[in-house]
Amino acid sequence: MNEIITARGSLLIAGVTIDGATVDIAVDEKGTIAAIGKDAKKTIDADIVIDGSDRIAVPGLVNTHTHAAMSLLRGYADDMILQDWLSQKIWPLEAHLTGDDVYAGTRFACLEMIKSGTVAFNDMYFFMDRAAAAVDDMGMRATLAYGFIDLGMEEKREAEIKATETLVAHVRSLDNPRIRVAVGPHSVYTVSPEGLRWCAEYAAEQEIGIHVHLSETEKEVVDCVARFGKRPAYLLDDCGCLTPRTVAAHCCWLDEAECRLLAERGVTASHNPASNMKLAVNRAMPYHWLKAAGANVSLGTDGCSSNNNLDLMEEMKFAALLQKFAWNSPTLLPAGEAIEMATAAGARALGTGPGTLTVGAPADIVLLDARAVCNTPLFHADSNAVYACNGGAVMTVLCQGRVLMHEREVPGEEEIVREAAAAARSLVDRAQDSS
Amino acid sequence: MNEIITARGSLLIAGVTIDGATVDIAVDEKGTIAAIGKDAKKTIDADIVIDGSDRIAVPGLVNTHTHAAMSLLRGYADDMILQDWLSQKIWPLEAHLTGDDVYAGTRFACLEMIKSGTVAFNDMYFFMDRAAAAVDDMGMRATLAYGFIDLGMEEKREAEIKATETLVAHVRSLDNPRIRVAVGPHSVYTVSPEGLRWCAEYAAEQEIGIHVHLSETEKEVVDCVARFGKRPAYLLDDCGCLTPRTVAAHCCWLDEAECRLLAERGVTASHNPASNMKLAVNRAMPYHWLKAAGANVSLGTDGCSSNNNLDLMEEMKFAALLQKFAWNSPTLLPAGEAIEMATAAGARALGTGPGTLTVGAPADIVLLDARAVCNTPLFHADSNAVYACNGGAVMTVLCQGRVLMHEREVPGEEEIVREAAAAARSLVDRAQDSS
């Protein structure tokens, strides 16, 4: 294995390109960026030196909406009507999921995210204690939420409350600054107002985040209005779920007033363009309204079964192109804003720092190959990163100063892939045996 | 260099996966698939053996609409209104293009296409004799058209006719079965009916293809109706340009009758989803109408300045997702049809064989990494290829039985990238000096 991956200590990235200039980046033992510039090397006595020539440094990417362990369901079923896909394919398989599956699937998802430049993610699923173990092993950051679904049933709600409290206690007990916990009320169509209210109060009391699906489909909006007399964002707001600690995924069918409401409450809207296109939700997130209102808009891949990958570099292209196409404006969401979405906006959402390459920020750093085909010619690095490259251009990934990948090598990759394949096969076998 | 790349002769791909079965593929000295199956190895005494374990074989991809040398303009200007982008950025730069630039840019484009699994492409640009030299050097197949633009001026038309005739004579003189020539009337808004008629007659006389842009924007349709009293497809038909040898790019704004007309004439419609989204053309190709009419629908990346890459694996995902989103149907353009678009439909369009892995077909073969993250788990290879993978999963590429890439190694890659970067820099410098 490359010794740069196994070494620990302070670190210097020498002669790397940032915004067209060649600089050094010094990272101290705590994993904080200590200096950036031509003289940065003088500020530390680096234990590790990474050659930054032919490399472009960008902040580590942040995936603000996924269901990581669903990597095991990649390609299991596609090209179906949403309801058939869920009821005939996804749910019957998920009924057989074990904690071991979630560990294998989350570890595999972390591998995929690291290989495409992601350092932190916002996750919602089940067996999240095992997801935490996987994140810990892989050295990434994550905010983990148990998917809270009460379907309006009090008994189920009590069980979900317990599951949520158990996860929060577990993650707190880990005392790992890279791993955070959030409350995960699934959506207004799967959680009762009572459940939503409990989630909001508990999140406030615990000072933790809220991770929720919002206005993914038109049906969600229509049903919500029919049932509660108000649109989903207003229902969430009534229940106290719209806070600066809230990440609302999808947000396709928000109207303009709801966009203003999200901005006023400090909510982050997570754009998930590939999933929205694949599932044909028939409307792209109104980014222009959210932007005009000053909302924080971040980027997410959604789970592997509705994307079908976790490559946030690719997702930036889908975001920038979908916004242009859906809202009929070739100038909407230019490359620089797409990168901001995938970095700083995500970091703000998850509270993992500024999400920029600045002194004092956590050293969450991605090095892209400046000699890659997709980076040639190199007129505008932002344009190439968004429109031409995918995760394959990512060469090195640092999270809090620790090297998770170097020259595309991630420790244990073969074993992680093999175990994910075995877990997926076993899951399908068990589901078929029982049917 | 890997000896499998330099070796010449008959070839065996041993133990490779096709449609879930493990088989051998035997390729004879002429580059034709001689046998496929468990006993294929017995049919030839192979000079070269490629280990197919952990590899999935698919037909080589065919890119049916691009402007290859525009790889030099990748990322030069983005996120602009189409007319500003062309008049302020692209055209001023193109005015300084030389034959050497086109050679460097096309060779670089070939490298990018090979690295993402493309074996053949349909090109339209200038200095196409130099493009032919690049294609020859790189071992790919291409159909080359000079972009014919008369703007209604007779003098210009005469010059375009001469340029077209010169290119046709040049390509014929090469006598290279991998390199074909076509007539390239740019579009109904840049070529007069007289010019279109000449193109159609000359193509018929020479028995060569026609490569044209069709109904990319609403403005094109509106202007055509105002000027000629008919929609673009009907104007092209009146001029004789709709033939089984015709590839019409974009086709976003076709109405249902035009889709039937294209099908009746045997025209191939080339879908270019990423370009259409990036330039915000406001309507996706009506694939459902073309499919219902029985038209041949293929896939293309368009040029690098409006995509911004030539990765047809990525383009399959854009096609499958854009169709679902734009026409509000999660079942439209399933994975298998996206692969058909990128392989067999393209091969039919360019006359390069069936575009399938079948005995007697040219050995245009791509080997994908079955152990890649994007191919794990491997429930459905088609789904993974379209929705999860990009060109990075392509390990080996054969064109007419010749190995163009093996284990991601392409001969001369570093030099080709370096020369493209230098050519792009020099082009911009010359343009700036003259402004």
PLM regions with names:
Chain A
Residues 74-140, 163-174, 422-432:
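Alpha-helical scaffold segments that flank or form the walls of functional sites
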Residues 238-245, 287-372, 386-390, 398:
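His/Asp/Glu-enriched, well-ordered alpha-helical/loop segment
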Residues 218-230, 258-263, 280-290, 307-324, ...:
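Histidine/acidic-residue-rich catalytic or RNA/ligand-binding cores of hydrolases
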Residues 16, 31, 54, 65, ...:
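Divalent metal-coordination and catalytic microenvironments
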Residues 72-104, 111, 138-153, 158, ...:
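Active-site gating loops and adjacent loop-to-helix segments of metal-dependent hydrolytic enzymes
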Residues 130-252, 257-259:
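Metal-coordinating catalytic core of metallo-dependent amide/deamination hydrolases
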Residues 1-23, 27-34, 343-435:
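Active-site microenvironment of metallo-dependent hydrolases
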